Structures are given as structure tokens and as C-alpha cells.
Amino acid sequence: GIILNDINRAYSGEKLEVEEYTSYDLALDNRDALASDAYKNAENYYKSVFENAGGSINFYPDKSGAAPTAEMYHRETSEFSVQDVKAFCKKHGITENVFFISAFGITLGKYNFRKDAVFTTIYHGRNDSRLSDTVGMLVKTLPVYCDFSGSTADCLNAVQQQLINSMNNDIYPFSQISHEFNIKADAMVIYQGDNFAFDNIGGEYAQEEPVQLNAAKAPVSISISIERNKFVFEIEYRGDMYNEETIKYLADNLETTADGILREYEPADIRLMFEEETKM
């Protein structure tokens, strides 16, 4: 992260640069943009993608607790390696972010016995080079429409182009998107990669300490990161809505989908565990 890098630079005796473009400057520019053609164009873009998409879907709850609770399930992937995914993405001209968002979308859609899915992701919000070293809450929620009725290649390419377009039109707020197109952050996927990996501060060994959750970001939110050269699924979920076994089963199915994509299977040929049961 930016702050950790600056702390390490300070410990090393480097001179720190003053922010040239601050989050306050961004807020002023965004205010002006609300009255510009950019805002209307962004609204029209989101309408073209989501107006007839039917709203977001989720993973059906299997219980109803008395009060909301936040739980976490941790899984290191074993079906495929970081190298497998990187090689696949390079071959097909997509990012690892697109790979996992698409795998999540296919999994979610199949859970709902559909060939498409609407859900959410987040991105860093730094779509302007002036923001590369700006400290602030720039992260934004983006809706995703994943259509996997055709080939895997078509699905991956469409998701990649859509994410690029959505980032370019991020002046249109998610609160408005949610209201206009009935899209809620009930099912969310976040690809972190190794962006937040660190093992020292100021030249001394440092270890990240997990913070106990008191509220879940969403009923189901999957964060995918790279740790010790393995992909890790951190699934944050509402313990009052889902049993841990249900979430473990979801992790199994997400791994199955990702592995199927790597094997060049078409979406219709990727069989999740419950589809095998149904088929039998």
C-alpha cells in the first residue's frame, strides 16, 4: 500500500514527496463532473448493460438466524497453481482479475440455474494517473454482468471489456446504479492478488494481524489473494444466513469452475458438484 511504502521510505531516510493531487481535489473535480456530459454518458452506459439484466442474484441462504453475525472461511487452492492462472491469462490476453470475476459469475449463475449472473466487485478507483500516489478512500463498488451462455472465450472477453468501460464511467455512483437497476452487494468477489503482501516495516519483520469482524460486507464476499505462491480464498459471510459447510461447498465449486476454465472447458461443460448430483 501507499502508506506502507512511504513509511519504509521514511525509515530509509528518503525525502517524501507532497501529494500533488489530493482526494479533496478529486472531490472537487467529481462535483464539476456531475453537471457535465460525462455523467449523462456514464448513466447511459450503465443503462445499456444493466437495464434488462434483471437485477443482482445471490447464493440462497440455508438458515435464518436471530441476529446478523460475521464469519470467515479460509481456503488455499489445491486444484491449480498461480503459474497455471498467470499462463492462461497471458495466453488469452486477460487479467487475473477478469479470470476470477468470470469464474465467480459462472459459479453464481449455475447456483441459480441460469446462464448469466449480476453481482458486484470493487476496484481501486485510481483510473487517473494523478491518483497513483494519492491517499484516500478511492475504492468503488462496480456491478458486473457475466453472460456465459456462449463460449468461455466470449465470456472472459466480454467481462474484461465491461470492466474497462465501467471503470471509465465510474463517475456514476453505485448508490444510483443500485436504485435504478436493483443491484445489491449481496454477492461480491474481490481479486487482491499480491498487492497487500508485505513482511517488513522499516527493515524489521512485520506480520499482518487479522481483525475480528463485527459485520460482514455482504451476505457472501470472496476475496482472492496470493500468499506463499498459492491462491487463497477468504470468504466472509453472514453466519446467520449460511452454515460453514455451505461456504466450504461454495469454495469447492468455485475451484471447480476455475479449474474448468483453465482446462479450456466451455461453461456448459463445467459441472459443479450439485449438477453432478442432479445428473445422476
Q: Predicted regions: what is each one?
A:
Residues I2, D6, T95-T107, T141, ...:
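Short amphipathic alpha-helical face segments that pack within enzyme cores
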Residues G1-N8, K115-I122, S149-C155, P173-F174, ...:
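Extended, hydrophobic beta-loop-alpha segments that form or line the acyl/peptidyl-thioester binding
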